[in-house]
């Protein structure tokens, strides 16, 4: 057994060969233990109480936000915890559904996960915006010429995967982001499959939204599994999402 697999309790059963990490990774012992320790010693609602436990839980929660920000080189205030990458995309699409007008265009690619396909399709249906998908070639590469042909001043948002969850193809997102910004379009990048395999610097990428899910790189699966990095605070005033208790 290699040194990495030794960190994962599930692989103590040496008959297991797990090839579905693109959907969700197994969890290392340190992550499992941290979760057990938190539930055993520190559990309380965050940002909602004044007792010692609540203060400790809130501090741990915000420490996690800072670690995420450091990991992807993002301003900590731009990090939003969500239920998953799917909810992150839906949150952005929900905001755009209130901004799009008849004749506006949304551009994605044919290689998108359904989570980055259906929300934009539905957002366009709500208000008569035009939904466009860039072709992929026979070897799975995004067709750059088709991207350029379908990109226009009418394009309001470009939503693309960084790395395909099916094909493993890495899109040239730096070039695509620049092309989109040149026509005034915002860009959302789905980094769910790239986050575990390459360094990510969202400020260098210069995208407007970057989403990923912790479960794709050995994080626990819980009610705050997703990460959304955003650079347009005003934009989110358009999105009504959730409810429940509030705080000033």
Language model features with spans:
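Pyridoxal 5′-phosphate
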Residues: 1-248
């Amino acid at each position: 057994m290699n040194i990495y697999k030794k960190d994962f309790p599930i692989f103590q059963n040496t008959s297991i060969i797990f090839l579905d990490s693109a959907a969700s990774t197994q969890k290392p012992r340190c992550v499992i233990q941290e979760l057990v320790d938190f539930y055993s010693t520190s559990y309380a609602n965050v940002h909602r109480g004044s007792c010692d436990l609540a203060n400790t839980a809130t501090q741990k929660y915000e420490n996690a936000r800072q670690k995420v920000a450091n990991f992807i080189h993002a301003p900590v205030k731009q990090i939003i915890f969500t239920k998953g990458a799917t909810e992150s995309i839906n949150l952005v699409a929900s905001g755009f559904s209130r901004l799009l007008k008849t004749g506006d265009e949304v551009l994605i690619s044919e290689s998108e996960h359904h989570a980055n396909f259906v929300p934009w399709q539905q957002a366009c249906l709500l208000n008569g915006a035009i939904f466009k998908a860039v072709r992929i070639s026979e070897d799975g590469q995004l067709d750059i010429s088709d991207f350029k042909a379908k990109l226009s001043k009418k394009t309001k948002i470009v939503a693309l995967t960084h790395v395909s969850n099916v094909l493993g193809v890495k899109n040239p997102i730096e070039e695509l982001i620049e092309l989109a910004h040149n026509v005034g379009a915002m860009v959302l990048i789905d980094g769910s499959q790239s986050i575990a395999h390459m360094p990510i610097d969202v400020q260098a990428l210069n995208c407007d939204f970057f989403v990923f899910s912790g479960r794709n790189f050995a994080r626990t699966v819980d009610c705050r599994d997703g990460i959304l990095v955003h650079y347009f605070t005003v934009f989110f005033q358009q999105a009504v999402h959730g409810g429940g208790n509030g705080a000033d």
